[in-house]
Amino acid sequence: MAPLRDRVSTLPRLQLLVLLLLPLLLVPQPIAGHGGKYSREKNEPEMAAKRESGEEFRMEKLNQLWEKAKRLHLSPVRLAELHSDLKIQERDELNWKKLKVEGLDGDGEKEAKLVHNLNVILARYGLDGRKDTQTVHSNALNEDTQDELGDPRLEKLWHKAKTSGKFSSEELDKLWREFLHYKEKIHEYNVLLDTLSRAEEGYENLLSPSDMTHIKSDTLASKHSELKDRLRSINQGLDRLRKVSHQGYGPATEFEEPRVIDLWDLAQSANFTEKELESFREELKHFEAKIEKHNHYQKQLEISHQKLKHVESIGDPEHISRNKEKYVLLEEKTKELGYKVKKHLQDLSSRVSRARHNEL
């Protein structure tokens, strides 16, 4: 049988919308089973809606996810990361609502992307009810980190690098972040693959064979293209990890942070002029500095959390109050920086994507 995208040509708007929303509807019961709490009215507040007192987000479904995450006892750093992701999701959804009112998302493409992004968040933090969605909980290096990689190839490379004597402690910390970034890319690839598979099954279930010739699956074709790009990035990432693990870091490294390295590699193959590429390089330097600052606050937050637990075990009210105040300040600063990093990453990624699309 021919591939789905070769067998379809046009899609009625209503059927397309149902299909695009299908992956979110298929999220396992722990998330989807909240009944009326996830009704359209409560998920899509009025434009002027403001946060209720004591709530983290303006959208009720995001507040529910936040409360669920806190019950899962995620680490402070993971919670701060989730908070930043949900803030980005909220911003994008509220912006989309404005576009929808103006009739600028008639085909539902932007709505489908929002659904996909939320699915990624659910999977990334283990909020989708699945047992296989655990990810590494810390950017910090510790004695048992190799057990968190979950891939024999990565564990072997990490062990080789750690025992080679070619890396300083700072370089090992840097290399560990590269391993984490690589693992996260694999995880998100699997999430996208799963979402795409369920969407393709939706075509089969929603439409009769006679309808199939009239459906154009542009959305699925776009996701297939995204899968190929991600797989290419994964393969390049593994090649880099192998090279660095065996040879160590060279003296002429352009950038150090994995996300910045990925962006720079993509930018060099995009349709940028020489002047635009140089401008992008300078912006990446600023972005890397922002990431390093965020990493610093993440480490301080972890240290503060451990210290607070120690003080609480002793039971000194004055020390508890002082340490809790410091912890809360660090937590808020880490959330704020995390949001800025993710927003900046989103903006830079969009610019590279547009440049690569223009080239095609």
UniProtKB/Swiss-Prot annotation:
Transmembrane segments: none
Pfam families associated with the record: Alpha-2-MRAP_C (PF06401), Alpha-2-MRAP_N (PF06400)
Compartments where found: Rough endoplasmic reticulum lumen; Endoplasmic reticulum-Golgi intermediate compartment lumen; Golgi apparatus, cis-Golgi network; Golgi apparatus lumen
Modification Phosphoserine, positions: 53, 138
BP term (GO), one: amyloid-beta clearance by transcytosis
Chief location bin: endoplasmic reticulum
Record keywords, A-Z: Coiled coil, Endoplasmic reticulum, Endosome, Glycoprotein, Golgi apparatus, Heparin-binding, Phosphoprotein, Signal
GO cellular component terms attached to this protein's record: cell surface; cis-Golgi network; endomembrane system; endoplasmic reticulum-Golgi intermediate compartment; endosome; endosome lumen; Golgi apparatus; Golgi lumen
Cited InterPro entries: A2-macroglobuin_RAP (IPR038003), Alpha_2_MRAP_C (IPR010483), MG_RAP_rcpt_1 (IPR009066), RAP_D2 (IPR038001), RAP_D3 (IPR037999), RAP_sf (IPR036744)
Gene3D superfamilies xref list: RAP domain (1.20.81.10)
Signal peptide as annotated in the record: 1-33
Coiled-coil intervals, chain numbering: 222-302
Motif position, Prevents secretion from ER: 357-360
Function per UniProt: Molecular chaperone for LDL receptor-related proteins that may regulate their ligand binding activity along the secretory pathway.
Name of the protein in its database record: Alpha-2-macroglobulin receptor-associated protein
Originating species: Rattus norvegicus (Rat)
Gene transcribed to yield this protein: Lrpap1
